């Protein structure tokens, strides 16, 4: 079936299409509500690395998944003991370790080994370690965190990664619905002003909104998605697929002129034209997201697969649901027609082609500072840096650092066959490592007043079994810092001297692995995405020179966007470079292909260089501006509103990227065509009229 015939079918069955699309929202909505969300990005690390295997051993052999430090200020020992007993009864709490776990609270604290006493006490209060029977980000652990907070008073503080994950979940659940609302409202306002009807943007949002619901609902079949994917997917899908809707509307208006007001015939041909044009554009966008799937850090796969699905559903909605809506609401569209609030494109086009050398010089002047900034922008890997400072977990972590000089806690799994004397030597050496506050094992709990046979079995079982013994090491250094990563290497050297199969695990080592893995991943994805786009442009335009020019211009736009934070001293979340690189690559290549296609057509029809480039610019600039400004509006609002820095930073980068890409494609790309026109026509097929 050719696409015109398909378009005629859509036009004929527009009412059934709308009914089916509305009915499909029911299962999609149910799927969306029942899709589990993962709030811990560390779980996306490869399962075969030592730190992840160690986490599994903790759960399997010790029944311990997550752990948190619980600070209690200004409470009598009896009250603390009673609170501890209540916490131990909370579902999914495996064990609580405190002073009374080792001895009766009537025993003077001076009789406890000094090392142990200093670990659990400060000038203002005391601290207990809470161990959970499930992982850091499991539903059970997060429910337990909520219950413990209800039991605790204002003078109690629950720290640790599980508390951070719980707060992230609570904040994201509150904010995510508003992200979509903000994006839609701002995009509708911009579209209403830049298009020639106030009603059309509402239809765009309805059809794209349906595709978004289908996409989010179908995530149910994946089992779970990350909170980053959930928060960004709707806004991203809106921004990425909006181009297709704009193209359909412009094509429909052109076809109405061609077919003298026969709207059904015009729409059938508009669907055909849109599908043909959108295929090239959507393939490049999909290719960018597929590149994310090459990451061993599987958050890339999570975002990539959801967005590939979103683009495909967006294309389907654009050639089925949107045309049906436009035909059914034609009267409303006509009643709300107006002149678009956009500058005179013709004047801009003439100036760009006449003054092209100015933009080429600006490109060359900005290129090297942009590359330098892009390569030196600082990033952070520590997840608590993405959250507001007034959240309970962040306050607790700061208190832990201030009162107990604790920043990071490592856990060490040592083979139980290693002699106690060797374990003691190992602990002594670890104590001497820079930044280690203390290292504790079962032997450290034993003192003159507490012989081993007096320690309850529940405590012994928690720290030692037939296969492994568990040690705790506290670090003064912050997660993801260079100092902590160096410390982890030193601790591993000592550990492997005494036990070659020993494992150092916890948030610090996991984050160190995250840094190493993502550094390699990002280079791979960047090369793969550029390679795929290069090949697509090569095939699309049958040209050797155009892939180099287009990819060069697109990468320049990305370098400018990602280089700005270096000069403003802004730190970005670690995923920013790869997510923004992929998204901006996808949107900019759409704009570039649109202008290049028209430039090729004009040259093929016999137009000279200047006229062909001016006409191509005039024909495509408005669509590029409408799309970019709408994407900017959708993302800037979310970026300014969100209290989760990971989401806020990504959205602000996307918003700025949309404007930079628009400027680069409107001013730099046609200037490059002016400079390299001779090379392009000689190295490309179909740019000159057939002889």
Segment roles from a protein language model:
Residues 1-37, 136-381, 486, 496-691:
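Membrane-embedded transmembrane helical bundles of large multi-pass transporters/channels
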């Amino acid at each position: 079936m050719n696409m015109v015939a398909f378009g005629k079918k859509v036009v004929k069955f527009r009412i059934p299409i709308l009914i089916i699309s509305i009915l499909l929202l029911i299962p999609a909505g149910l799927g969306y509500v029942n899709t589990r969300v993962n709030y811990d990005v560390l779980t996306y690390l490869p399962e075969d690395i030592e730190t992840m295997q160690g986490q599994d051993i903790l759960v399997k052999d010790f029944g311990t998944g997550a752990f948190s430090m619980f600070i209690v200020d200004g409470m009598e020992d009896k009250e603390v003991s009673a609170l501890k007993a209540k916490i131990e009864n909370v579902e999914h709490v495996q064990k609580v370790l405190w002073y009374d776990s080792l001895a009766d609270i009537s025993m003077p604290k001076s009789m406890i080994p000094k090392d142990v006493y200093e670990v659990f006490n400060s000038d203002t209060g005391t601290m207990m370690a809470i161990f959970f029977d499930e992982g850091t980000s499991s539903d059970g652990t997060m429910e337990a965190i909520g219950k413990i907070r209800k039991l605790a008073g204002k003078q109690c503080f629950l720290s640790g990664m599980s508390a951070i994950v719980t707060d992230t979940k609570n904040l994201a659940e509150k904010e995510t619905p508003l992200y979509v609302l903000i994006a839609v409202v701002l995009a509708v306002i911009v579209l209403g002003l830049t298009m020639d009807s106030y009603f059309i943007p509402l239809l765009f949002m309805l059809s794209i909104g349906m595709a978004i619901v289908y996409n989010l609902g179908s995530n149910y079949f994946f089992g779970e998605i990350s909170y980053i994917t959930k928060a960004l997917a709707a806004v991203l899908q809106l921004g990425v697929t909006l181009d297709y809707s704009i193209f359909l509307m412009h094509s429909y208006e052109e076809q109405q002129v061609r077919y003298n007001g026969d709207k059904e015939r015009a729409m059938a041909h508009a669907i055909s034209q849109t599908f043909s044009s959108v295929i090239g554009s959507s393939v490049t966008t999909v290719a960018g997201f597929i590149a994310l799937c090459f990451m061993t850090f599987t958050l890339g796969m999570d975002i990539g697969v959801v967005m590939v699905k979103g683009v495909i559903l967006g294309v389907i909605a654009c050639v089925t649901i949107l045309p049906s809506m436009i035909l059914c609401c034609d009267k409303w569209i006509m009643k709300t027609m107006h002149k678009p609030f956009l500058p005179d494109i013709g004047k801009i086009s003439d100036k760009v082609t006449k003054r092209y050398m100015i933009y080429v010089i600006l490109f060359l002047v900005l290129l090297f500072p942009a590359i330098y900034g892009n390569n030196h922008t600082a990033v952070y890997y520590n997840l608590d840096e993405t959250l507001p400072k007034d959240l309970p977990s962040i306050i607790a972590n700061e208190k832990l650092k201030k009162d107990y000089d604790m920043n990071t806690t490592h856990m060490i799994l040592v083979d139980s066959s290693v002699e106690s004397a060797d374990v003691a030597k190992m602990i002594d050496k670890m104590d001497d490592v820079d930044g280690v506050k203390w290292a504790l094992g079962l032997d450290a709990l034993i003192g003159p007043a507490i012989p081993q046979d007096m320690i309850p079995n529940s405590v012994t079982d928690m720290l030692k079994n037939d296969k492994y013994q568990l040690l705790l090491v506290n670090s003064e250094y912050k997660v993801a810092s260079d100092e902590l990563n160096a410390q982890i290497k030193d601790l591993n050297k000592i550990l492997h001297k005494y036990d070659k199969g020993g494992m150092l695990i916890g948030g610090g080592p996991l984050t160190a692995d995250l840094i190493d893995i993502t550094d390699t991943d990002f280079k791979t994805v960047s090369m793969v995405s550029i390679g795929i786009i290069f090949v697509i442009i090569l095939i699309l335009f049958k040209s050797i020179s155009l892939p180099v020019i287009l990819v060069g211009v697109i990468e320049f736009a990305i370098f400018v966007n990602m280089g700005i934070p270096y000069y403003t001293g802004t730190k970005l979340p670690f995923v920013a470079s790869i997510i923004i690189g992929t998204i901006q690559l996808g949107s900019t290549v759409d704009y570039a292909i649109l202008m290049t296609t028209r430039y090729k057509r004009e040259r093929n029809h016999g137009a000279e260089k200047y006229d062909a480039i001016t006409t191509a610019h005039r024909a495509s600039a408005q669509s590029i501006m409408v799309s970019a400004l709408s994407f900017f509006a959708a993302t800037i609002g979310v970026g300014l509103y969100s209290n989760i820095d990971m989401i806020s930073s990504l959205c602000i980068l996307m918003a700025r990227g949309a404007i930079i890409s628009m400027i680069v494609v409107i001013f730099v790309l046609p200037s490059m065509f002016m400079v390299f026109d001779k090379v392009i026509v000689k190295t490309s097929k179909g740019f000159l009229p057939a002889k």
